[in-house]
Each structure stands twice: as C-alpha cells, then as structure tokens.
C-alpha cells in the first residue's frame, strides 16, 4: 500500500527528566522531544483496465483522489497525574477511519473509547470460457464491504483490588461482494454438454454484532486467577444472487427461453454466552501449573428463502415465463439451533534440569449441537396444453409448495494431549521433540421428511464417528560459529476418520486416512567479506511436504462397502532465499525469492468425459514464484531515498474447455514504488511516493488485467 503511516520513536527517558523522574533544565544542546504529531496526506491513482481488480488487490480507490489525516497522536496531562490521549486517522473517499480517546490515572484505572471503519473492495467478474471467448459482465462490476466497530472500555487498576475490565463493542459489516457460486449458461458454443457455470454472482451483506465482555484478574500468593464472561448478539441478513440460463432468451434460443434470477436469503439471529476461569500457579521457579475451564452456549433462530424470478429480489408467486422444470426453491424457512460446549485444559511446565524443559498439556472438549427447521419446498413441472402467454410451450409452472421438516444432532467428546521437551545442554546446540495426540468419539443424527414432488427425498442418517490424530515433531538448531547457524525440523502427522454408519442412503464416507510428512531446513549465513564491500547476510530455506489421502465409501442403496482407495496425493516443495547487503553505511539492498511447486493428484484425472478424450479433472497445480526487493540510500542527514519492487508469476492455467471450466492461476504482476523523505525542519518531515502496478491474468481472458499509477504525498508535523 502506498499510504505510509507516520512513525515515531519515543526515548526511554524523556527530555527534561532524569531516570528517577526529577525534572532538569533542558539545555540548548539537548534534543527536544515532541510527544505529539499529525501527518497529513493526499494521493490518487490512475488506472486503466479492470479498476475493481486493482482496488481489491491493493485496497486503494481507483481514479479518484483521497487524503486526510494519515496519523495523529496527541497527549497531555489531566489533573495532577492523569493522562489524556487521542490517536487516530481519517481518510476521505477511502472510508478509512480510526479514533481512540483515552483517559487514564495511575493507581485508579482508565476509560477509553473508539471507532474504526475500513473498506474492502471486490471485483464482480465471474468466469471466462476460452471456447468462443464467452464472458458475462457482472451486474455490479465494482463492489465493496464496509467493516467497522464502535467500542468503549473501562479498566479498574487499584492496588490490592482485582484488575477489572469491562468492554462493550458494536460491530458491523455492510455492502456487497462477489461469490464463487457462479450461475450457468449453455451459450458456450460447444456441441456436447455445453452448460458451464461461469456467470458472475454476488452477495448482499448486512450483519451486526453486539458484544459485552467482563474480565477480572487477581493474584493470590503465587497464583494468578482470571475470571471472565462474554455475551454476543448477532443479526445476519445476507443473500446470494445468481443467474441460471444466463442470456438464454429469444431469439438466441427458442421461446420462452431459460434465463431466470435466483435470490437466496439467509437470516440468522444468534445469542452466545461464554464464561471462563483460568489459573496459573508458580509452584517453584522450575515448576508451573496452569488450568482453565470455559463454557459456551449458543442459540440461534434461522429464516430465509430461495426464490426464482425474472429479476433479483423477486416475490414468490410472480409469473416467471422462463421457469424450467425442477427449479427447486424454498420459502418460509424457520428453525432453531442450540450449541453447548465445555472445554477443560491443564498444562505443566517442568524444568527438572538446568538445560531441560518439559511441557505437558491435556485438553477435553464436549460439544452438543441440535437443530430443527421447517420450510415450504417449491418446485416446477413442465407446462401442458392449452398453451398461453402465461403458460408457454416448453416452459414450466410452479407446483403447490410442500412442507418439509428436518432436524439434526451432533454429540462428541474430544481429548487432546501434548508432550514437548527441549534440551540445550550441549554448547551451540538446541534439540527439541514433541508429540501431539487427539481422539474424538461422537454420534451424528440427521433426518429430513420426504417430499418427492418437490425434489426432496427421505433422509435418515445415524452414524457413530471417531477420529484419531497423531503428530510427532523433532528438530535441532546448531550454531557452529558466529556467522553461521542451521535449523532442521521434521514432523509426521496422521489423521484417521472412522464412521460406523448405522443408517443412511446413497453414498457415504466410511473412513479416511490422512498422512503428512514435512521436512524443512534453514541456513543463516553472514559471510565475512572485504570491509570495502560492507556486510552481507543470507537466509536459505527448503521445505518439502508430502500428503496422502486414503478413503473408503459405502453405497447404501446397493448395501456395498467399497474397497479403500488412495483418493489424493499432495506434494509441495518450497525454496526461498533472503539477502541483505549493506555495502555502505548509507546504502542497503534487500531481496527475497521464493519458488513453490505444489501439485494435487487424484484418481479423477483418469476419468474422460465421453465422447471427449481429455481428462475432465486434471491434476491441480499451484506452482508460483515471487521476488521482492528494496533499495535504500541516505542521501544526507535529512534526505533518504527508497525503491521497492515485487514480482509474482503463476503459470498453472490448463485449457480444457471441452470437458470443464479451465481452472488454475495464470497471472503475472509487477509492482514498483519509489519514495523520497525529506526532513524540512527539526519537527517537519515530507514524504513523496510514486507507484506503478501491472497485472496480467490469463485465467480471466484478460478481463482482470490492469495498469495503475499512484501518487502520494505526506507531511508530518511533530509538536
């Protein structure tokens, strides 16, 4: 980001005071300390191409000026020993605001309040289909969500009394953002299986949350006790908006067409209460014990609907001439859910020897969840003669909504343990090892009433679940010389999921095993080079991760338990190098390079979609490399110059439109910035910065490409 906050360094002993707090006369030769400052800034960005993509990536508004107070700090005495302070910033056309006001008094406490708001931008573009270059412009090309909170906090800090903190917070999230649940179209030009989900979709977001928190901390001898509680009330009213059969209207297709708009509204009113108690006891300097317990209960009321119409936010019952058979939806959703969770943990830190540290931990969790809901299921059936404008041939009409009820419950117990040991008894060596174990046992029940005429079949699931996780870690740090150190680590992790299914329909996962091995090594070197070349530091790191996934399914309609099959193999190599070079006291150079090779292999890559011979699902690749660098030069005691450059490249795009939507990132990005800072006076500093951005994206067919030029100027005044 080109907007740079002003910074300041506050000395440990303020000017005009000695270390014992007594005032002294400030001489002319002493440097005056400024406790307060304000930084004013103004800037702007000129973009060409996809402005929304630039805004999403760099969180800067495009093609408009912005500015205001970039950073502010003011403090002053209040009464005899109190302190008043204000911190914040405010940028117009950026929707970035933050202010904190605090009053504090030693041996009494404080009160502070604040408000924060910031904006995140989103690009509304959907998918791109390279066959015939099919692309649907989004309903809203540029979207944003404003997030913020207003809060007040009171703290009591009276000696010999518990430290009490009370805080109230109101949070909000409001706006629109893109969704990757894309709509579909068959206007792709393919002769076989032409339908693809590439049509952009978006979400309307309207969420608020009120939080009240209370904490009390008190020390009794060698034991610290913390008690606290938290209450939350959340209100969520969001919606998903997508198209089906986009563009499929006469005369492109035969009447009546198939374009329709779906609005799925999700409503949730939630109340949460949690309480906790934590103790920390220092039995001896070499033996500590901590324990904690928390209880959380959550209740929510849900509502919503899924309505198909000729436009977004349509009312149920409006005529839809383009309605298609089996357009499922629902209305009048109502339901409740309850969650109760208990967590207990205990930890022991033991240092039996000077060079040996042992940490043990235990955690128990009990979780109980129940939910019930009812709704009216909607569906459609093909039109029959006589055909009319409101009952067109080839269209469909809605059926009478059918009531459906569903409920589910989950109950499980989870146990976790950890043992960690560290030993540094050998000179220049540190050895460590750890083991983590987790066991879970539970039961899942799901039921949904049958409504075949609306596309809902009977669902009845009863399964006992179990999980066993193990992770073993070992590592070593070696410091053979002042200018060289090495670190190596290896871990092995397994996770075994086992579902004992008592009742179900169709296909269910009966068991799955994940096995991960990770090895990484880091070398830090500061080679001795000729003094005329300054100093040099190098950090080299290599990381290898290998994961296998073995799965087993049961097909209950055939009463068959399938053989276990390796369903996935994930391999990842990460190579990185960092360099810092200071050839002169006034000059430095930093560079970082990383290369990632990541591939996921599944049996699906051997499946060909008839009549084509291309694989429907290819191995997923996420290979990319990045370069970041920076150069700084101190021109004189009042002026310094900086240049930064970053580069990103991913070449994972695979073009197989005949059988799928081409996925995989194929993008290249360059970012360059240059800044100069000038100390105008002893309390005034000026900053000028220029930035250039260039982004090219193959996956989007170039629709996400952009170039941008940014200018920013900031003036900091200390007082």
Language model regions located:
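Solvent-exposed loop segments that connect transmembrane elements
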Residues: 125-136, 177-200, 237-266, 301-334, ...
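Transmembrane beta-strands of outer-membrane beta-barrel pores
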Residues: 42-48, 56, 61, 66, ...
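Residues that define the transmembrane beta-barrel architecture of outer-membrane proteins
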Residues: 32, 63-70, 93-97, 144-150, ...
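Outer-membrane beta-barrel "beta-signal"
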Residues: 45, 678-679, 707-719
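Repeated loop/turn-to-beta-strand initiation elements of outer-membrane beta-barrel proteins
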Residues: 79-85, 107-111, 161-164, 174, ...
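Residue-level signature of outer-membrane beta-barrel architecture
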Residues: 74-78, 103-105, 156-158, 218-220, ...
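Membrane-embedded beta-strand positions of outer-membrane beta-barrel proteins
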Residues: 38-42, 86, 101, 111-113, ...
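Outer-membrane beta-barrel initiation region
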Residues: 12-80
